[in-house]
From Swiss-Prot:
Bilayer-spanning residue ranges: none
Intrachain disulfide bonds: none
Assigned keywords, A-Z: Signal
Stored InterPro entries: SGP
Family: To C.vinosum CV1 and T.roseopersicina TR0.
Protein name: Sulfur globule protein CV2
Signal peptide stretch: 1-22
Lineage of the species this protein comes from: Bacteria, Pseudomonadati, Pseudomonadota, Gammaproteobacteria, Chromatiales
Record organism: Allochromatium vinosum (strain ATCC 17899 / DSM 180 / NBRC 103801 / NCIMB 10441 / D) (Chromatium vinosum)
Length: 124
């Protein structure tokens, strides 16, 4: 019986302390009405200010060497880009000087290939 009385006393003390520490009424000092949903937002959606800056930049640089028309293109190259010896880049009749001086269409740019040296004969 003594154990039952002790258990009842402990339960009563725990119940009283739990009730005393509970929040009775609106929390955080509220007025006691309203749902409380969104009350923490204040006037956040009233006056506002925003700023946005964006900058974008790009660039490129290149350097290349090569042949386009004959042995070069532009001032300072032999024959000023017309090739050696003055062949056009597109062929007849669209070459620099027309037929028969223009290279045929589809032929490689630049000077013609030099003929092969004759074979040496064996003489003893």
């Amino acid at each position: 019986m003594k154990k039952l009385a002790t258990a009842a006393a402990v339960a009563a003390l725990l119940g009283a302390s739990a009730s005393a520490s509970a929040w009775w009424g609106p929390g955080w000092g509220g007025p006691g009405y309203g749902s409380g949903m969104g009350d923490w937002m204040n006037d956040m959606f009233g006056d506002g200010y925003g700023d946005f800056n964006m900058s974008m930049s790009g660039g490129g640089r290149g350097y290349g060497r090569g042949n386009g028309y004959g042995r070069g293109y532009g001032y300072g190259n032999p024959y000023y880009g017309y090739g050696y010896p003055y062949y056009g880049g597109y062929g007849a009749p669209y070459g620099a000087y027309g037929a028969p001086y223009a290279f045929p269409y589809g032929a490689p740019y630049g000077a013609p290939v030099a003929p092969a040296a004759p074979a040496q004969s064996e003489s003893k």
